[in-house]
């Protein structure tokens, strides 16, 4: 019987963690999905896994939320998924410096900021909650500040946990060492 690749096992575990954390009750946006997206881009050798892990996390959790609450699927899903794809690309940019707390912390702040800017611009353009004026756009961003705060907290904390644990494992466990 063939052993499972440790990085593949990690990907599956991340999908499970992200799904569980999104489905369980939590403060808005305080989930590991942004951190998982950043981490996936930085730590998975294959691009398909880097994108598949956060997309699978979102799709499985969105489906469960739709089944159990009726609020999993919505019209802005393509924008949300595209935003997480941008965060995966950001992770690919920080890949070579994933053992730097400053780089990972900056990446986490950038990922929350990217999500805040893109998703709220999409809300402003696609909904009737705000007038299509500069004042309406500003009102949309101001109303979303609390969500940005919890996303920022989640991205920073979960990124520290994910990257810290992974860098430790790469240094201590040969099966996690990056192939040279």
What is each PLM-predicted segment?
Residues 1-43, 48-49:
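Hydrophobic transmembrane alpha-helices
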Residues 98-171, 176:
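Membrane-embedded alpha-helical hairpins and interfacial helices in multi-pass inner-membrane proteins
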Residues 50-60, 104-112, 179:
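Central hydrophobic cores of alpha-helical transmembrane segments
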Residues 33-37, 71-79, 104, 137-141:
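Non-cytosolic membrane-interface motifs at loop->transmembrane helix junctions
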Residues 8-13, 48-52, 77-82, 105-109, ...:
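Hydrophobic alpha-helical transmembrane segments
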Residues 20-31, 57-90:
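Interfacial aromatic-anchored transmembrane helix boundaries in multi-pass membrane proteins
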Residues 20-21, 40-47, 86-98, 165-173:
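Structural signal for the C-terminal ends of transmembrane alpha-helices
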């Amino acid at each position: 019987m063939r052993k499972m690749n440790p990085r593949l096992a990690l990907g599956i575990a991340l999908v499970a963690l992200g799904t569980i954390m999104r489905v369980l009750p939590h403060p808005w946006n305080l989930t590991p999905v942004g951190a998982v997206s950043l981490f996936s881009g930085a730590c998975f050798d294959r691009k398909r896994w880097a994108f598949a892990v956060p997309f699978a996390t979102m799709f499985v959790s969105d489906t469960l939320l739709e089944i159990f609450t009726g609020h999993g699927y919505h019209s802005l899903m393509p924008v949300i998924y595209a935003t997480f794809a941008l965060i995966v690309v950001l992770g690919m940019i920080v890949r070579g410096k994933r053992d730097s707390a400053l780089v990972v912390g900056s990446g986490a702040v950038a990922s929350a900021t990217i999500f805040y800017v893109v998703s709220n611009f999409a809300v402003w353009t696609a909904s009737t909650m705000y007038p299509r004026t500069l004042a309406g756009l500003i009102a949309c961003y101001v109303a979303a500040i609390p969500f940005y705060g919890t996303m920022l907290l989640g991205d920073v904390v979960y990124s520290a946990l994910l990257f810290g644990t992974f860098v430790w494992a790469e240094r201590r466990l040969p099966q996690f060492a990056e192939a040279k």
